[in-house]
Amino acid sequence: TASWRNTLVGEYVAVGAAGQRQPQGPGIEVVDSAIPEWTSTFALDWRHGSWSAAWVMRHISELREDCGNAVAYPVCSNPATGTNVLPATSYHDFQVGYRFDDFKGLQLVLGVNNAFDKDPPICLSCSLNGYDASTYDIPGGRFFYVRANLRF
């Protein structure tokens, strides 16, 4: 089974307490918060007998931000305009499971999220160690798990 979910944010307007428009919008990173223009999740599930497997790809479109005081440093991708581009990022998750026929309703699943250990892009306007934790996986974020499901 395959599924593909996409979200496009065409417009976003935030208004502050005093009624002023905030500098936030689709594709813009501002102070630890981003609204990606595109997000996409593709999932491929396979089942055969007692076995199951899945691959999920999560994609976040590129973001732009102000370089601020870092405009003079190489980490700012476009010092001429004072903007930095956080490149599009994709994460890959895999899992495999087995349903035990002797224990009706028991399934064991082994999986890994962010299988290729993709680090988030460097964010100059973010205060949390240079990345946006609300948008991206944590640095060094490969995560292994074991899950047991019991249905009765």
Residue ranges of each PLM-predicted region?
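Short, well-ordered turn and helix-capping elements at secondary-structure junctions
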Residues: 8, 95-100
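C-terminal beta-signal and adjacent terminal beta-strands/loops
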Residues: 13, 58-69, 98-152
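Extracellular loop and loop/strand-boundary signature of outer-membrane beta-barrel proteins
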Residues: 25-31, 72-73, 78-84, 131-136
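Residues that define the transmembrane beta-barrel architecture of outer-membrane proteins
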Residues: 36-40, 88-92, 140-144
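Membrane-embedded beta-strands of outer-membrane beta-barrel proteins
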Residues: 42, 53, 94-96, 146-148
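Extracytoplasmic gating/loop element in the C-terminal half of outer-membrane beta-barrel translocons
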Residues: 54-93
